[in-house]
Amino acid sequence: MRYKKYFRKTSLKQKGVGDFFLNEVKKKSPKIFLEVGVFHGVTARNVCELLYKIHKNDFKYIGLDLFEENNENKSEVIPSTLFSNPLKNIYFKYIKKQNPYSLEAVADFLKKFKDNVNLIKGNSKSVLKKIDMSKIDYVFLDGGHSYSTVKNDLECCLEVVLSNGTIMCDDYNFGHLPDVKNAIDEFVKNNKLNCRIICDGRFAKIEK
């Protein structure tokens, strides 16, 4: 299955990366998928399309994000929410009349799967601990990139791996900011888990 960009911004924009990611998800064919760091919802839409092909309506997607730029994420490394393509700025500002990073815009973008999707607005440090991880099959971590945030997100999702699920972490080789790699390496070592670094160092795939 090909990864589509849907005229929006996505962190998986590099050639072949999105396709590689979807192929990894397809291998596990999860029924309940959690994404931390939804951004414009492009990966969410691709995952929902894939899971619908596999399971029809028998799947759930949970997406967590702050859905706005504020004091809670100003210290984090997040993709720019501004488009370099002026046509995209015109499209969202004057035609859609939406901020593509807002909860409302992402919900509208995913409305095809509204019965399968649960979008949660909030900080992962407070929200993840409230989610029943025993139900989750697959986690895609692409939220905050600080050491403390990645450490928290991984620890909150540990039960997923212990229940034979998968945690896929983005930006493992985030060269100029090693916090992501350091937090992942420590988490894997402390919990004696298996971790494969794949897609030329882009992803860390953590399993039991």
Where do the language-model regions lie?
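S-adenosylmethionine/decaboxylated-SAM
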Residues: 2-11, 15-208
